Amino acid sequence: MLIIYRLLINLIFIISPIIIIFRLIKKKESFLRFKEKYCFFSKKKIGKVIWFHGASVGEIKSVIPLIEKITKDKKITQILITSNTLSSSKIIKSIKSKKIVHQFFPIDTNYLTNRFIKYWKPTAAFFIDSEIWPNMFFNLNKAKIPIILINARITKKTFRKWRKLNEFAKTLFGYIDLCLSSNKETINYLKKLGSKKLDTSEI
């Protein structure tokens, strides 16, 4: 199943310049920053990097208090925040800390996710809500970087879709080192999908 996914995501990668052009016209992408999705990076500081990823505004807002606390930790040199939308990048600018750096999440190809991980070398990767990316998870696991799913949310509809993928879903969710969710239904779904370490907490 991972092979099929990689074929599909590579096809998306091939046509992605066309998609980007349309998004630029609609002002949903930054002309100066869209290349980050192809792994053109911001400057990295030497030291410990913690990484947070959220799809858009809501997900990022939900972890701002946590991120602000982490900025006070002297052991952490840089906090990388990735997202998928232009609007979320504006929210991140409101966090007043020199430790914060924002990047757009790379297209989930095997090559780009590998390149991303090798460049940033995060100590831990925090994914917010229901952000599950097969190639990124596979390569984080291969690099032995802990994956933590925070404020996890899996709906009944999403659960049914993942269950159809059976072994692929179990492998993918098995890569997650810790799932945090205050939603009992989500915890139950995650358990059935293959997640092993679960905590009924919400950040």
Predicted regions and their residues:
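Membrane-interacting alpha-helical segments
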Residues: 1-8, 12-22
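Active-site and donor-binding regions of nucleotide-sugar-utilizing enzymes
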Residues: 17-203
